[in-house]
């Protein structure tokens, strides 16, 4: 059975990463709730996807340049009763909700000290390391963060995944884990864009290595019925989705592949179909995107806008992100 991971808790129906969204994702039976961590200028670890607050909250602040005293006064644009949560609050919530599991997307725009702070806060909330090791998955974007977590010991015996748009970066984590050959710090999985799983690089080169070494695959952000069909034709461990209720129904309607076989083979749709046009166009977009976003020049701002941000807005418009 595919593990259903609520993206930003329950983004499709409720204000993302808020207490309301967490409650609804838990009630919906999400296997894991994915959320995002940022850190204020005075070291408070908070739950928010963006590094600034303008999209979700009633005043635009850069979290890393603002104090907790400033951030805590913000209210959600969609529901004024909701405030930004701290990591401590959401971990306390998890303790009070039996079986709740969290996937922590730790943004690389923060300082690495956020990892140590996160570890310390876990033990402040409940001084039981085994409890947290069974309930927390660390999501890291850059290889030096994985190395930092190993050097400091904070990742020991936790589930750790690499989150990346790039299969090359995901492969770097896999290689480091295999070279390290330490069960206490073994990479649990990779979390990659759903379109990357359609590529030959993933299916023919990376996937066999992952399966041989029992490294799981999560795909984000999977919402459309056709994309769940593709997902279920591959040995995918988890779907990160905006709507956990809809996702469970869609997954239940398909037989999930345990491993690539002649009987259960991933079949790319024909270019002669609407699904096929989308499929092949999205692969082209994905390949171009990976090339562009890892180029320094696309992050240069002109009139306050970077090319990377314009690309991001376009991709949201076509439901690529």
Curated annotation (Swiss-Prot):
Protein name: Phosphatidylglycerol phospholipase C
Tree of life domain: Eukaryota
Gene Ontology terms: cellular component: lipid droplet; mitochondrial membrane; mitochondrion
Species of origin: Saccharomyces cerevisiae (strain ATCC 204508 / S288c) (Baker's yeast)
PANTHER family found in the cross-reference section: PHOSPHATIDYLGLYCEROL PHOSPHOLIPASE C (PTHR42758:SF2)
Annotated knockout phenotype: Leads to the accumulation of phosphatidyl glycerol.
Compartments, record wording: Mitochondrion membrane; Lipid droplet
Gene encoding the protein: PGC1
EC category name: hydrolase
